[in-house]
Amino acid sequence: MTEIRDDSISIALDAMGGDSAPDVVIEGANLVLSGVVPCDGKVHFSIYGKKEEVLPVLAKYKLVEANSVFVDVSDAVSSSDRPSYALRHRRRSSMWHAVEDLKKGLVSAVVSAGNTGALMAISRHLLGTIHSIDRPAIAVAMPSQKSSFVVLDIGANIECSADALLQFAIMGVAFAKAILGRTDPKVGLLNVGSEEVKGTYAVQEAFSLMRAAKSKMDFYGYIEAEEVFKGEVDVVVADGFSGNIMLKTTEAVANLLMSLFKGVVKSSITAKIAACMLKPSVRKTMELVDPKLYNGAMLVGLNGVVVKSHGSADGKAYACAIKTAVHSARYAIVSKIASEISEMG
């Protein structure tokens, strides 16, 4: 394999993680390198996996082979592994070695479509957390009628204290500034209603804490799931249980609508002609709601860039996760989040 230039971003890929690994992982890398899913600047990869499974796939993608180094490992994290088991027994896995090399500074970011709980546990164990952060969260950007917003947590912390939700809000503000380019992000707390008496005890307590911190953040108040896509807020804070359900329901509805639309287009010659006439506008609208293009959630609060791809991602979706990792690493998202957290106290 060719020598890698020093001015490029190095991304570690867990080739054993995901429903269709390693094929989707290598395909995603190829889409990035070929410019189908463009990234900022030059990119090269460190690919971690079992050689008997990865090398035959890698041989089919000469562009990836020429712009990567392969690291042979003897183990892989299973989708059924509990986080504690992965910490004790998966230290020879592709996921562990990828995160460990990030800790050593050998790569700039890690992308994995593997077991979420194991990825969070291994990353937290090896990288540690940003100062003053107790519980890292998983954050992802989503589209709205006005622009886009970030939602966290989407699955790392099923149950959260009020203090944890406040920390999520602070990290969300930092993420929105660094990734979305917002100057004064508005924060909404996901709830079942807008009245102060609604919600769990932790959510009500978090509401009080965020309102008290209004001098440090623009707190919108409670926001219901039906309102988040109107673009009224830049950051949606939720516990991992609620956030994950909101995310996956949204993705399912988006996929349903896209499927229904395609069915209508194929239903008649008139519909096909109309679709052809409106093709540019239709494509643009479809891209705005395509879950694949928003694949790639960042584990925020860690001392390193770790991006989680959907386990069911296809090549294009995985490439978008790589794009998120490249952008986050190139623009020093971790140091920017740490700086924002320090300023907000």
Curated annotation (Swiss-Prot):
| Molecular function GO terms recorded | phosphate:acyl-[acyl carrier protein] acyltransferase activity
Instruction: Write the record's keywords in alphabetical order, separated by commas.
Output: Cytoplasm, Lipid biosynthesis, Lipid metabolism, Phospholipid biosynthesis, Phospholipid metabolism, Transferase
Which catalytic reaction applies to this protein? a fatty acyl-[ACP] + phosphate = an acyl phosphate + holo-[ACP]
Keyword Cytoplasm belongs to the record: yes
Q: Name one GO cellular component term.
A: cytoplasm
InterPro entries attached to this UniProt entry? FA_synthesis, Phospholipid_synth_PlsX-like
Q: Under which pathway is this protein filed? A: Lipid metabolism; phospholipid metabolism
State what protein this is by name.
Answer: Phosphate acyltransferase
Organism, scientific name: Anaplasma phagocytophilum (strain HZ)
